[in-house]
Regions:
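Alpha-helical recognition/docking segments in bacterial nutrient-uptake
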Residues: 1-3, 7, 62-181, 185
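N-terminal helix-turn-helix DNA-binding module of bacterial transcription factors
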Residues: 1-65
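Short acidic/polar active-site loop segments enriched in Thr and Asp
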Residues: 18, 66, 123, 189-190, ...
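Short beta-strand segments enriched in small/hydrophobic residues
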Residues: 21-24, 62-74, 190-196
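Hinge/beta->alpha junction and helix N-cap segments in small-molecule ligand-binding domains
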Residues: 55, 72-82, 101-109, 131-136, ...
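Short, well-structured alpha-helical segments in soluble
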Residues: 111-122, 127, 237-255
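Flexible loop/turn connectors
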Residues: 244-350
Length: 350
């Protein structure tokens, strides 16, 4: 291979490292470091291939910045605002200022923000929130982050490990399986699930874990009682209205009554409680309700809501540390377990 045709990607393949690692080893970075053994491997590969680094790329990689970009789906959702508070606190300790993008789950807006952060030479980008079952959109964002990291930036995510970056992974399935076991232990047998958007991977994982937990106990979930809806308070409200219309909520309905409703996030559960009250139903007297996340606003909800607690502010700090950490050749995955918190909305039956 002649030196006129050698690219940084060729060097990365020759050294057996990622493109981002090869870039940092050769171009340098004011923000990220490479382990000495990786740097030596990359430089040796570059020498073998007679690679000539690009002066402009080196200048950009070494440029200093105090910006950290944070992408969330909906900053009005306390789940994301609490993660953002953890990111902001960790960024401030590192002398950085957070630039926030609330994308309303729009993949195009995510890409545009990554491109903006690249132009502004932000030190790192964090993507917080579950992905959708959309290979094209996920790959496009992953490619944009590879390009960003190849120029010296750091990147990390909260959610599914689909973007090729260090990721804080929420153990959704095991958490909801445990919730199913504990509610079953309190006497609940017939459930409905407010399942969120059909292609949202976090919603799918939470539903799947709950369904598996019930099946293992010999109490299979009726598919007719799985209600897709928006991942919002209003989505939970409308989904509960549909269950009431089916006649399965409360003892006076036309169908076989359910014991409890599990909403795959807390804001949906809050909406479901409001819809139940609007229909003249008592929570938990007529129907028990549980959620997921333990968002901070639950302290104002009556009855207190059974949920799965996530350390949301700590998750924000963790993902910031990953985004700012020295480069690692393979993406690091940090699992976070949820903790079932039983409260007044799901009292023992009988």
């Amino acid at each position: 291979m002649s030196d006129m045709t050698v690219t940084l990607s060729d060097v990365a393949r020759e050294a057996g490292v990622s493109l981002a690692t090869a870039s940092r080893a050769i171009n340098g970075s004011a923000n990220r470091t490479v382990r000495p053994e990786l740097r030596e491997r990359v430089l040796a590969a570059a020498a073998r291939l007679r690679y000539s680094p690009d002066a402009n790329a080196q200048a950009m990689a070494r440029g200093r910045t105090t910006a950290l970009g944070l992408i969330v789906h909906d900053i009005a959702d306390p789940y994301f605002s609490t993660i953002a508070s953890g990111v902001t606190a960790a960024a401030e300790r590192a002398g950085l200022v957070v630039t926030l993008a609330s994308t309303d789950r729009d993949a195009g807006r995510e890409l545009a923000f990554v491109e903006l952060m690249q132009r502004q030479r932000a030190r790192a980008i964090i993507v917080a929130g579950g992905r959708y079952d959309d290979d094209t959109a996920n790959q496009a964002l992953a490619d944009a982050l590879v390009e960003y990291r190849s120029r010296g930036g750091g990147a990390a995510a909260v959610g599914q490990p689909l973007l090729g970056v260090d990721t804080v992974v929420i153990e959704n399935r095991s958490a909801t399986a445990e919730l199913a076991r504990q509610l079953h232990g309190r006497g609940y047998r017939r459930f409905a699930v407010l399942a969120g958007p059909p292609r949202h991977l976090t919603a799918h994982e939470r539903l799947d874990g709950f369904r598996t937990g019930l099946a293992d106990l010999g109490a299979p979930l009726d598919p007719d009682l799985v209600v897709p809806c928006a991942f919002t308070r209003d989505g939970g409200y409308e989904a509960m209205e549909r269950l009431v219309a089916q006649g399965v909520v409360g003892r006076g309905g036309s169908g076989q009554p359910i014991d409890a409703v599990f909403a795959v996030n807390d804001v949906m559960a809050v909406g479901a409680m409001a819809a139940a009250r609007a229909a003249g139903l008592d929570v938990p007297g007529d129907v028990a309700i549980a959620g997921f996340d333990d968002i901070i606003t639950l302290r104002d909800i009556t009855p207190s809501l059974t949920t799965i607690r996530l350390p949301l502010a700590d998750i924000g700090a963790m993902v910031t540390e990953l985004a700012l950490a020295p480069d690692n050749d393979a993406p690091r995955l940090v699992p976070v377990d949820g903790e079932v918190i039983l409260r007044d909305s799901t009292p023992p039956l009988g």
